[in-house]
Amino acid sequence: MNTAVNANVVHESEAQRQHARIKIPAKLRLLNDKPNAPLVRIEDLSAGGLSFVAPAGLAYTTGEVIKGRLQFLIDNLGLAMDVEMQVRSVDTASGRVGCQFQNLEAQDIATLRHLITSHLSGEIVSLGEVLATLQRDNFTKARKVKGSDSGMSALGRLRAVTFSLGIFIVGLAAFGFIFKTVYGLYFVSHASAGLVSIPSMDVTMPREGTLQSLVAQNGEATKGAPLATFNTSMLEMLKGSLTGEDLQPAKIEELYGKQMSGTMTSPCDCVVARQLVADGQFASKGQVIFQLVPRNAPATVEARFTYRQFNDVKPGTRVSFQIAGEDKLRTGQIVSSTNLSDTDLSTDIRVQIKPDESLSSSLAGRPVEVVSDRGPSVNWLLDKAMAAGL
């Protein structure tokens, strides 16, 4: 047995092979732009070409391009197909001419393949099958060739990359928004109200009269220093100590016309947080004139949460807050949690927060937004990075 490899054997791929030549009852009309175009019988037919015997008086040369019309008879109906052929071989002895199809359209190729395949398998070709073959897509799309001389231009690639990057950024932003919304819904508790609270002391009007402040708002006043002066009538000063003779109308009118002035002093080393009565305005006895804040008094933040957030605002819980008018985000710790009202049941909880950084007394009364975040913390990672000097 000879197992030697024959070097002359060439293996073709299936895409390079053509149908075998078959003898099929078909005719070819040679188009020569004349009314009496000759009609010849096809000797051999394949998917790549055909052969016929040239009629007398016609001579063809190799390489010549001729036009013709293939004619088939199917279900007693004629099927014609215009083709363009190139002469590849000419037998002068027998007059046989071998031609190769040129520039066949996709429908023509599909029809030829269907006729040849049906003939080889012994099936009877019907007109319905031919029409069905012409209606469907019998060819796959050409693959994209990756090369420098094909594909998109540099501008086209830039546009594609820009569009893809834009879609990616929009998708990333949408994912971030959804993640933030879900995180805030399940892991973040917001206070319904909050303010900066500082222990204050009220200074009241000793007598009825008009007021004139001596210390501006947010100004400092030492203990015993004058805060304001007031003017009142003599009648107000002597009220309660007048006898029967002093109650005469003329005497009362005289006392009312006399004015006396007095001075109010600061009861502590304080800062004037608020002035509740404007200069030159009348104030009744006992009315609160000033609210004083002890100097260097620790400021805290008071906030109100709903009772459903009971487990989120326990003493010792870390919170973050932002004071109105500031961009800085501060942190603190809840030191107490009480019911909003001591006399009845309430749906709100009042918490007191001790800030990590001291607050200025000028911030007293400002609204505060308080947030309790109970989600996974990465503070340990930040502390480790700061310790490493990153």
Swiss-Prot record:
Q: Which GO terms describe its cellular component?
A: periplasmic space
Places the protein is found: Periplasm
Q: Name one GO biological process term.
A: alginic acid biosynthetic process
Alphabetized, the UniProt keywords read: Alginate biosynthesis, Periplasm
Supply one GO molecular-function term: cyclic-di-GMP binding
Per its UniProt record, what InterPro entries does this chain match? MFP, PilZ_domain
Q: Which family does it belong to?
A: Belongs to the Alg44 family.
Name the UniProt record assigns to this protein: Alginate biosynthesis protein Alg44
Protein species of origin: Pseudomonas syringae pv. tomato (strain ATCC BAA-871 / DC3000)
